[in-house]
Amino acid sequence: MLDFMDYIQLSFAEATHWNRDNSYSSLNTTAQSILDFSTPERLRVHLSSLSTPHFATSYTLGTVGLLDGSVSYLFSTVPFDNLPSGSASIPLRKISPGYRQVQAPATPIETWGWDSLLDGVSIPGLTNGSRPEPPIPKDEESIKESEAKRKATLLHASLHLPPPSTLYALFLRRISSNMQLSLAVCSTQGPPQSKSAPQASMLTQLSHDTGKYSNEYLFSTDNALFGWRGLWNFGPDPRYTRDVPPPLSLLSAGAEAYYSPISSLIGMSTGLRFTTLPAATEIPPSSSPSSTRTPISTFPYTLTLTLAPIVGSLSTTYSLRASPNLAFSSRFGFNVYSWESEMVAGCELWRRTKKSDSSSDDDLEWARRKMRMHDFGVSLPGSPASPLLEDPARPEGPVSSNAHTEAETSDSVIKLRIDQSWNVRLLWEGRVKELLVSAGVGLGPGSFSLSPSVSSASGSGSAQSGGGPGMSYWRGVGVSVLYSS
């Protein structure tokens, strides 16, 4: 489950129309949301509040052997007037990432109104030679809101205690409609008797997104590390195409490279991603003209392939959403130098307790549509009248008016993960009264070479102190409670 501050930062990206999918760092986000979730450690309590539309605070208290906690503050020039901030109204699918439906690439929206040398210049392929003019504010309140968006800036600081305390700080600013600057600082307090300055490092990241491709330039003061990440989307350029049918699928290729002149560190990786887009799983209304393209009636899925040639690592993932409330994912990794392999499988199941009269047939109708068991213009008996069923897993823009409905229908989610060593992680996240609760457990056998009968009895895991051969043990169990207002 995301922290409250992560939820605010996610809302900031949506409010400023920044496409998080069009980045090489998000290539495996769909599989990672299902396979790489973490379970809480012992007991942890989060108290958060969106005090004003521009300012948020968060306090965390945990017990992991000893008491620890953190204090966080966040300020944004973009107001969050209509953002659900109470733990009773936050959409669970927003704060608990699951199967991520990648959206089609789009041209960055001109909502800030910067002057450009290309304004008024006719570009071949565009129906309109000039960029759309931003709306003119009508009153003083609209002027302030327009000014805030023009200078979209986010400041975040978090102090982790007890000593040695660690300070995290983030400065995020939209330079233009397609560029974003991020400065992240981490400082750790030295030993009590040490007179040296606290260890600190800063990561600078400049992101450039055009819709067709994206570039990220990074520099870290830790060993003077330079980095670059890029992603290219195959298909038509959204900047020069207008009034075309939405694409059904998307193939993206990307790469990253790092170099440190101090430590002579070199890193490189490349990857591919193929995913279905929302248009591939939507069925047009029967009133639509027959001349339009017929979408592919299929289950949404995402395939990725990543390769790190220097270390000889190869990884593939396959994620599938079998219904609006059920998703599966698997990952296979292999190293050509050490012959080590990794196999991980996981799933997530969303549970609804408050349903409408017709919602009991929604999942069955949704699956039948995907398997081409009925025509586009004909509804099955007992199915909703509309041929388009609302997909609760589809990401939306800035939180809309149906956020409260989504929060009511998605009450809890169960996530399960298992790997080739029978390490098992089970996580439950849901809403209890006005609290967001996350409870998880990890299990493991005491030996890697256990017999199948013992492995099935012990359940999962790998060796750790306190677990001898043939003995099962708890890898960890914990509960996290979040309350926000």
Curated annotation (Swiss-Prot):
The keyword Chloroplast does not apply. It is a multi-pass membrane protein. InterPro entries: Mdm10. It comes from the Eukaryota. GO terms for biological process: establishment of mitochondrion localization; mitochondrial genome maintenance; mitochondrial outer membrane translocase complex assembly; mitochondrion-endoplasmic reticulum membrane tethering; phospholipid transport; protein insertion into mitochondrial outer membrane. Keywords: Membrane, Mitochondrion, Mitochondrion outer membrane, Transmembrane, Transmembrane beta strand. Its main location: mitochondrion. It is found in: Mitochondrion outer membrane. Residues 136-145 have a biased composition (Basic and acidic residues). Residues 450-463 have a biased composition (Low complexity). One of its GO terms (cellular component) is SAM complex. Residues 126-145, 384-407, 450-469 are annotated as: Disordered. Lacks alpha-helical transmembrane segments, suggesting that it resides in the membrane via beta-sheet conformations similar to those predicted for other outer membrane proteins and porin. Component of the ERMES/MDM complex, which serves as a molecular tether to connect the endoplasmic reticulum and mitochondria. Components of this complex are involved in the control of mitochondrial shape and protein biogenesis and may function in phospholipid exchange. mdm10 is involved in the late assembly steps of the general translocase of the mitochondrial outer membrane (TOM complex). Functions in the tom40-specific route of the assembly of outer membrane beta-barrel proteins, including the association of tom40 with the receptor tom22 and small TOM proteins. Component of the ER-mitochondria encounter structure (ERMES) or MDM complex, composed of mmm1, mdm10, mdm12 and mdm34. Associates with the mitochondrial outer membrane sorting assembly machinery SAM(core) complex. Belongs to the MDM10 family. This is Mitochondrial distribution and morphology protein 10. It comes from Penicillium rubens (strain ATCC 28089 / DSM 1075 / NRRL 1951 / Wisconsin 54-1255) (Penicillium chrysogenum).
